[in-house]
Amino acid sequence: MGFIYENILRPILFKMEPEQAHDRGRAALMAMGALPTICKLIRRYNQVCEDNPVRLFGLEFPNRVGLAAGMDKDGEYPRAIEALGFGHAEVGTVTPEGQLGNPRPRLFRLPEDKALINRMGFNNKGSEAMLNALSKNYPKGKRRMPVGVNIGKAKITPLEEAVNDYVASFRTLADQADYFTINISSPNTQGLRDLQGAAYLYDLLQSIRGENLSQAKKLGRDPHPLLLKIAPDLTFKEVDEIVGVLLELNYDGIIATNTTIQRPRGMSSTEKGGLSGGDFIRKRSNDVINYIYKATEGKLPIIGVGGIDSVEAAGEKIDAGASMIQVYTGWIYRGPFFARELAHALKSKGEDWI
């Protein structure tokens, strides 16, 4: 199937404008997710890898491979994602109210680099719409894989009031999220990355943690696992400061890394936005993961993201210190059954990709 996708289907899709192709893929996955029998057949064909589950953040993941945030922005088709071999899906980024995102064109392919540049700007339907979609299509308690919710700040919200957006989305989606990821690292919402700095970070993360503990106590359940997604463009000194806050506040993990605003020498595109996929982000992400792993002596679980387009690239993330991985751009280039390939290779943790 990988050969058919890469040699027949992908060339057809890549003749379309990138966001149009994304919308076609979204429609196909929504249709698939609405047909449980089809999902079951695809899942059976896929031989979804579940024989070596990963226990992390108090959750059980069928395998080490997740779909990164940005694909299923509104939580509309996690059932289809599960059938394609993923061990978890991260939906979003979602904001309290829906927003259109940045003007088109805002998504660009770089086939020679197996990369994408995006400046989407958190286009989504809002947290209430996501709640309804998850409740209807893949309700908590009837899942075979965890669903994380990636929450962000609305474009119009001042940085000083950003915490209100994160807390609002948390409250709305707490009943359907298995874990939450705090996204303060996208380069496509003006000023968002400033939240990674000392002026905002501690108070923001403390407020979200406080809301989490308060809700858990009120409802008599365990708190949700909380993760933070960071940029690859931070200095190691900045990474140290962020990790220190996460450890102090007992956050459950970190996702490393988001897209980069840097460009490798010789890259043909001059488009602005976040670069994902390719060797440049793969190597930088590996460096950040390994730095965090060593700095924390492995005490802070890491989900590795960035430049995973092969079994070998996925293995590098695990070797660097990641407990699990997420893919997005590599999935676009390698096709719908790429997750299955990765999951089966990674179940042995260190043997199949050598």
Positions of PLM-derived features:
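A gly/proline- and charged-residue-enriched helix-loop-helix capping module
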Residues: 92-143
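C-terminal helical cap(s) of enzyme catalytic domains, especially alpha/beta-barrels
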Residues: 98-114, 263-278, 330-354
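An N-cap/entry alpha-helix motif that binds or orients negatively charged groups
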Residues: 4-54, 118
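Short beta-strand/loop segments at the ligand-binding rim of alpha/beta enzyme cores
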Residues: 59-66, 142-149, 214-234, 294-304
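Active-site glycine- and acidic-residue-rich loops that bind
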Residues: 154-167, 194-195, 200, 227-248
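Glycine/Thr-rich beta-alpha phosphate-binding loop at enzyme active sites
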Residues: 30, 37-48, 187-200, 243-298, ...
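Glycine-rich phosphate-binding active-site loops on the catalytic face of alpha/beta enzymes
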Residues: 87-99, 184-186, 253-261, 314-341
